[in-house]
Amino acid sequence: MLIAWPDRVHCCEIMLQEGARVVDAVEMAALNGIEQAVGYAVFGVLVTSDHVLNEGDRVELLRPLLIDPKEARRRRAVSA
């Protein structure tokens, strides 16, 4: 289970029963900041909360974007 913020990353390993879903992993992990998640991914691929996990899957909690990526690039280009 992985959740990242601009200034830190939290990663934890949890053991689940065979056939466990993403929502089961999220509930078991009980990470701080989990309520900010707007979606889930497994190894960078978007999945639903009902996605069945396989052994070794890395579940990522996705946060909302703070700024549009195109706008961020424009701002960096102007300040460079």
From Swiss-Prot:
Q: Which family does it belong to?
A: Belongs to the UPF0125 (RnfH) family.
Query: Gene3D superfamilies under this entry?
Result: RnfH-like
Please spell out the taxonomic lineage of the organism that makes this protein. Bacteria, Pseudomonadati, Pseudomonadota, Gammaproteobacteria, Lysobacterales
Which superkingdom heads the taxonomic lineage of this protein's source?
A: Bacteria
Read off the InterPro entries from this record: Mopterin_synth/thiamin_S_b, RnfH, RnfH_sf
| SS bonds (residue pairs) | none
- Alphabetized NCBIfam families for the sequence: PRK01777.1
Native source organism of the sequence: Xylella fastidiosa (strain 9a5c)
- Supply the name of the protein: UPF0125 protein XF_2346
